[in-house]
Structure formats: structure tokens, C-alpha cells
Regions:
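Nucleic-acid endonuclease domains
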Residues: 1-81, 88-187
């Protein structure tokens, strides 16, 4: 795996947090998902991932469209050469790292991605997450990792028969992700 490590600036964290506070009206309203603060932090994690991917596309001089949605619906995260890229972001605890984690996809989100003609899914991990509190520690969150990508339709090959949580209908091991450099060559 040829992951890319990217430092996370305070400005990026602040921009992502402001976005999360706007998005809370439209996301993570499922019963039992946790406190309002925990839900904001889940959106914050996703927003950091999107901004990190945007930064990496810019650094690689790849032209793209970006939808940093704060309304009810979004059509895509990124579009490059008319190909839609979805970005999934998960937090990890520094002491445990991210290598044991997987790309998870919920059934309803996967079906929506197929309807919207998603081409690729990129997995990003950020440090500083506390799994017990389900909160991101701003002071410990300083690095993101673009772990790789998968062609979106291939996610269906990873149906998770041992589903334990909301959102783990599909479970893609990191070893099955392609290096992000390969995606960039195809753009």
C-alpha cells in the first residue's frame, strides 16, 4: 500500500469544524447515534478528510470539482474528468494506528452511490480520535493518511456477513485498496 501522509493544519481543522456545525441539520440524525457533540465530530472527521483530499488534488495539479455541501443533498464529493469520487474518512487512535482498520460502507449509502454513478471511493484516516468518547481531540489530530481507493462497483464484493454496527454492511480490507497514485495516473 502506497499511502500518502498529509499534515493537518489548524486552519483546515477550523474550516472543517465550521462546516460540520452547518451540516449537523442534515446528517447523523439517526436514533441512537450519540450526543449532538458526537454527531458533530463524525461530520467534522468527514469534512477534514474531504479538505485533505482537495489539498492533495491541488498539490498534484489535478483539475476537479468539489461539492462541500451544507444543504440537505449532495450529488458528489469530487468530480474529476466527469468521474465521481466519494471520500470516506475514519478517525483512529494514535496508539493503535490505522493499519487494522477497514473501509466501511452502509447499504443505503452504497445504493445511493450506484444511483449517482460514483466511480471511485477513496479511504482517508485521521489521527486523534478517541473511540471510547467517540470524539476527535483537536490537539492530537495533526495527520491524515490517504490509504488508497477502490472502484466503487467493486465494494459489492465485500459484503460483510458479520455486520455488527450501523454502516458496516460492506467491509473492504485495506489490502484491497489500490494506491492513490494509480488513480491519479488514470485522471
Amino acid at each position: 500500500m502506497n499511502e500518502i501522509h498529509i499534515p493537518i493544519s489548524d486552519d483546515l481543522k477550523n474550516e472543517a469544524y465550521e462546516h460540520a456545525q452547518k451540516r449537523i441539520k442534515f446528517e447523523y440524525d439517526r436514533a441512537g447515534y450519540g450526543s449532538r457533540e458526537q454527531r458533530i465530530h463524525m461530520i467534522w472527521i468527514g469534512s477534514i478528510g474531504q479538505l485533505l483530499f482537495k489539498k492533495n488534488l491541488e498539490e498534484n495539479k489535478i483539475n476537479f470539482e468539489f461539492e462541500f455541501q451544507a444543504g440537505k443533498y449532495d450529488a458528489y464529493d469530487f468530480r474529476v474528468n466527469n468521474k465521481i469520487i466519494d471520500v470516506k474518512t475514519s478517525g483512529f487512535e494514535d496508539s493503535k494506528g490505522y493499519k487494522y482498520l477497514n473501509l466501511f460502507y452502509a447499504e443505503d449509502q452504497f445504493a445511493a452511490g450506484l444511483r449517482k454513478n460514483y466511480e471511485y471511493c477513496v479511504q482517508i484516516f485521521i489521527n486523534g480520535y478517541n473511540r471510547i468518547d467517540r470524539l476527535l481531540d483537536r490537539t492530537k489530530c495533526n495527520e491524515g493518511v490517504i490509504a488508497g481507493y477502490i472502484e466503487f462497483h467493486k465494494i459489492k464484493e465485500f459484503k460483510n456477513p458479520l455486520k455488527r454496527f450501523w454502516g458496516d454492511d460492506y467491509k473492504v480490507p485495506l489490502i484491497n485498496l489500490e494506491p492513490i497514485s494509480k488513480l491519479y495516473k488514470n485522471m
